[in-house]
Amino acid sequence: CGGLPPVKSGAYLINDEMIDRLVNRPTLDHASNLGAMISYSIANEIGVNSYIYDPVSVDESNKIAKVSGLKELDRVCLTHALNTRAMAIKYAKMHNKDYKNLNLIVAHLGGGISLNVHEKGRMVDFVTDEEGPFSPERAGKLPSKMLVDLCYSGKYTYEEMAKNIRGKGGIVSYLNTVNAKEVEERINNGDGYAKLIYDALALQVAKAIGELSTVVNGNVDAIIITGGIAYSKYMSESISNRVKFIAPVEIMPGENELEALAFGVLRVMNGEEEATVYRETDLIKA
């Protein structure tokens, strides 16, 4: 559910107020906004509750993490919160540890790439897909002065430039494909340029992990690499080799959103977690 203002992690009970926000004042136009609407409609018909869980707008970061470097612009926490937090909780259970006692860095590698640092159960800082590593179709962090020059060059319209950053940026801008498997096939066939771009992606992810490790003063219990691209041994090992000096690396591949939703709400139903009732007046900022 991408169109909500910043919210805390966990489950939210879907209600009329949430639907009104998503229909009339969404903060982000995204297909995931339909999930709450569809769920609420079905739940009302059969007389049960419906929930969202860890939407992309989860924001538990401290004020210091919002400072961007330009007064008019605050950093905005829009990350793959559902999968990254689910993998952090799953990692803790796998190792018989309490998630709330761990410091974890989770990197989600998919069509977009984002990272979070989890400090004792809270996602206190982040690297979004607009300010960090490039990905198969997103440009990530770009040189700001050169970007401004390109925007005002007359070469592109606003819509074209926005698409260049999200949709035509990243790997596809260099290699004309968004398919990581195809890139690896090209590397295996001796394509040196494909290797350069793919290795640059691995390096940028590793640098973002290193950046987030400073948030907890280097006290990191584990680094988790997840998302669809984490299935790639080449990519996972390339990143791991650069960051394993910080903390042990756990590869947990896949975009496990459906599992995360199911287990999140199951924890609510079992009394392990309590769902929050969505109210605009309670939000971090509305």
What are these regions (language model features)?
Residues 37-40, 52, 67, 72-101, ...:
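Glycine-rich phosphate-binding loop plus the immediately following alpha-helix
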Residues 10-21, 42, 46-48, 67-70, ...:
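A glycine- and small-aliphatic-rich helix-loop capping segment at beta-alpha/alpha-beta transitions
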Residues 49-55, 105-107, 125-126, 251:
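General beta-strand structural signal in soluble alpha/beta enzymes
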Residues 163-218:
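Adenine-nucleotide phosphate-binding core of ATP-dependent small-molecule kinases
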Residues 1-31, 60-65:
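Short beta-strand-loop/turn "lid" adjacent to the catalytic site in phosphate-handling enzymes
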Residues 220-239:
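Glycine-rich phosphate-binding loops at beta-strand->alpha-helix junctions
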Residues 230-231, 237, 250-286:
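Glycine-rich phosphate-binding/hydrolytic loop that grips phosphoryl groups
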